[in-house]
Amino acid sequence: MNQVHIIEAIRTPRGKAKESGGLSDLNPHELLNVLYDDLVNKEILELDLLDEVILGCVTQQGEQAGNIAKSSSLYAGHPDSVSGLTINRFCSSSLDALNIGYLKIASGQHSFVIAGGIEMMSRVPMLSDNAAIWTDPKTALDARIFMMGSGADLIASLNKISREEADLLALSSQQKALKAQESDLFKSIVPVFNKSKNLTCSKDECIRPETTMDGLSKLKPSFEKLGSQGVDALQLKYFPELKEIKHIHTPGNSPAMADAASIIFLSKHKHSSNAQYKSRATIKGVAVVNDDPRLVLSGCKLATSKLLKECNLSVKDIDIFEIHEAFAATIINVQRELEIPEDKLNVNGGVIALGHPMGATGTVMLSSLIDEMERIDVSNGIVATSGAAGAGTAILIERE
């Protein structure tokens, strides 16, 4: 099999998923084009050599419908010969897009692939696709599908994670993210300009510098009402060892909704067609799993554990981890179960503070991981995401 090299990893800032957000004036095609143009303008990418664009996108509705990987490639002026594939594996989508690109190059089918994700939650709201698993109780029950927040509260209840622990995790995420932003550590960000060439967004917008434990403690649980409408009773039936479901998740310790796009340029060569741009990292292993769908967000723990086992490695062998903060309890559980040291885990904050643009999140996290690996001069790292229904993906990368 061919070795697969990451030549470049770039992303837009994460904008607030509101009409007032810094990215909301651009449509998804325009936002992706900012990143495509960056590769071309730097002469990293020679378009005639590009084989395929593969993107993750969760809410494939409206402006994000119609195979946005292919349509955005055409919009950007890529050759007609460039294939396009859009996938939805919930919040693991962009890492799974990357995995598909990795496999196509490793197998010899392709030489150059752009893989990543897009989600414009300000313009295409979460759940606006009206999928039956979210809107029809019978379908959800038959498929054993729960909303993400309900799953997070279940994980907290099963693992005896307190509200205070969740709030402390959220506060730490905010503090680390703010420090990283003020220290200009997010080097992978490509500033976004509008059609009039005015700067609209150059940094992640979701960080809340004013966050305190006192403020977090005053927020009301977000999913208690949903629980009282029958979800709690169903979860207690499935997990009889529990006496109650503890609703510890609030807007303060849950991931912030965001707009963003991210792309990773993959190659079978150690450099792009322009030899100036050499491989930043290689992909050394991938694990794709699905856990019990009733647990909803346990996939990143299982995927990380599987990846380590398959690569014959332990947590001690990994220099740094970027793990999806899919609600506070999920990341607390990952850290506890896998015994990841604090100084190796999400060292520059996570999506609770920085924002969670669903279909783009995994490769946004990967770009930040590579930035940090280069900054502190370490050799390897793992990025992992959870998705709904127990989905999980983890990827091991190694610097050249």
What spans do the regions from the language model cover?
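N-terminal amphipathic/basic leader segments beginning at the initiator methionine
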Residues: 1-17
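N-terminal extracellular/periplasmic Venus flytrap/periplasmic-binding protein-like
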Residues: 10-13, 24-25, 30-34, 168-269, ...
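Glycine-rich loop/linker segments at domain edges
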Residues: 12, 16-19, 102-159, 228
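Conserved beta-ketoacyl condensing-enzyme motif
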Residues: 23-92, 97-112, 118-134, 192-203, ...
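Conserved catalytic cysteine-centered active-site region
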Residues: 26, 59-110, 143-150, 217-256, ...
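Short, well-ordered amphipathic alpha-helical segments that serve as non-catalytic structural scaffolds
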Residues: 28-44, 68-72, 97, 148-155, ...
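Active-site-proximal alpha-helical scaffold in enzymes
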Residues: 87-118, 156-186, 263-270, 336, ...
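Glycine- and Gly-Pro-enriched alpha-helical subdomains that act as flexible
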Residues: 269-317, 335
